[in-house]
Amino acid sequence: MGLPWYRVHTVVLNDPGRLIAVHLMHTALVAGWAGSMALYELAVFDPSDPVLNPMWRQGMYVMPFMARIGVTDSWGGWSITGESVSNPGFWSFEGVALAHIGLSGLLFLAAVWHWVYWDLELFRDPRTGNPALDLPKIFGIHLVLAGLLCFGFGAFHVTGAWGPGIWVSDAYGITGKVQPVAPTWGPEGFNPFNPSGVASHHIAAGILGFIAGIFHIAVRPPQRLYRALRMGNIETVLSSSIAAVFFAAFITTGTMWYGSATTPIELFGPTRYQWDSGYFQQEIERRVENSLNEGLSLSEAWSRIPDKLAFYDYVGNNPAKGGLFRAGPMNKGDGIAEAWLGHPVFQDKEGRELTVRRMPAFFETFPVILVDKDGIIRADIPFRRAESKYSVEQVGVTVSFYGGKLNGQTYTDAPTVKKYARKAQLGEVLEFDRTTLESDGVFRSSPRGWYTFGHANFALLFFLGHLWHGSRTLFRDVFSGIGAEVTEQVEFGAFQKLGDRSTKKQGAV
């Protein structure tokens, strides 16, 4: 037949049986990949430290998606929250992975069956015997099924009526766990950080989809609309389906990059804007201030700060810091976090408290500058010592630690002070193991960054695909001309089965 590689999908253009077959095979590949990827991630995942070495630092991609809808335990006896588990049941990480692989095998067999038995009576008009599909009715059936699935997820899985619930956490990603969520029907349901909206919106969207599906099954489209939108052409279905997919990809790109309601920071890592806005830094300062007001010492106040919160306040966990083309998990960059060393407070010889200006997300390198409470530069690590006026040695800077591993310790020697000033530029001071994974010191992005980049690109490609196929179906008569023999040739080809010379039609051009 000699079709070029970019035209091979013509084979299923007017062949519903094999169109079903290739979709089944595609779904088999997707399910098989998901299950296999989950098993691979489980093989390399280290569950020993959920606070400083969580799944997003290790580069896990499919595990966070399982965890956010209630799968948190392993047959290995561990949970991502750090507890030991004695009886996780079938719906563990391994169980979900094997279920996907089993589903993939069944879908493969179904694809083979539909490829072999492609010419079913179901695809023929009983009155004429000609191949015919009632595409508006098929659209309605799909809407009904999608609506039922959507409603079921919101009404049963999320609410815990028949399912585990979803991952719910506080605003700072400290206390997250899987729990049932009750739907909310007031304006608070539209708060993008309110998990109750997940339940209510799925219930509402499911009901709407079901009603819309019944409508499209029962009510025929007007003839003019049917013709104007080419509702009888399978390429119209392709075009509108691509539109639905690229729209969903754009939406989830935004919710992944900017939001954390359905993509919790405990599972996917912090967002870029939490670093840019000093989100965790402000919360830490608020907690310390409250503790001081209660009469605690500075050391006691900082010792109350959870390691988890301090760990978030570190630029290396910012997904925008990693660069798009540096392969590997975050741990391959700065290393495996082992401990929070504490909060460093710098002082000059005149007793002024100094703060290291933090590195913005955009910069790879940034000068180490220490400023006082009024924002005036009092010390730095100079590029050229010959012209230096504010060097650590000249200003006599010391550093004291509060909270963490170095709580209560003070350093006065300049090399040590400069070492911690460089670390403080990146946020809270942490200790990393760089040897185990041979980490190279170059920041990596988190799965949040990978997902966003991938789906933004796919959404753009699918948008162009929607325009292409939409144009083809709307202007098909312009492209191919009009006439009985041309329609026969373009629509159905010279063969009953495209490319199969044994099924040559009589009277075809």
Curated annotation (Swiss-Prot):
GO cellular component: chloroplast thylakoid membrane; photosystem II
One family name in Pfam for this protein: PSII
Origin: domain of life: Eukaryota
GO molecular function terms listed in the Swiss-Prot or TrEMBL record: chlorophyll binding; electron transporter, transferring electrons within the cyclic electron transport pathway of photosynthesis activity
TM annotation in the entry: 21-36, 101-115, 140-156, 203-218, 237-252, 457-472
InterPro entries tied to this protein: PS_antenna-like (IPR000932), PS_II_antenna-like_sf (IPR036001), PSII_PsbB (IPR017486)
Gene3D superfamilies: Photosystem II CP47 reaction center protein
Keyword Transmembrane part of the UniProt annotation: yes
Cofactor note: Binds multiple chlorophylls. PSII binds additional chlorophylls, carotenoids and specific lipids.
Keyword Oxidoreductase: no
Subunit structure, interactors included: PSII is composed of 1 copy each of membrane proteins PsbA, PsbB, PsbC, PsbD, PsbE, PsbF, PsbH, PsbI, PsbJ, PsbK, PsbL, PsbM, PsbT, PsbX, PsbY, PsbZ, Psb30/Ycf12, at least 3 peripheral proteins of the oxygen-evolving complex and a large number of cofactors. It forms dimeric complexes.
Protein name listed in UniProt: Photosystem II CP47 reaction center protein
Organism (species): Guillardia theta
Lineage: Eukaryota, Cryptophyceae, Pyrenomonadales, Geminigeraceae, Guillardia
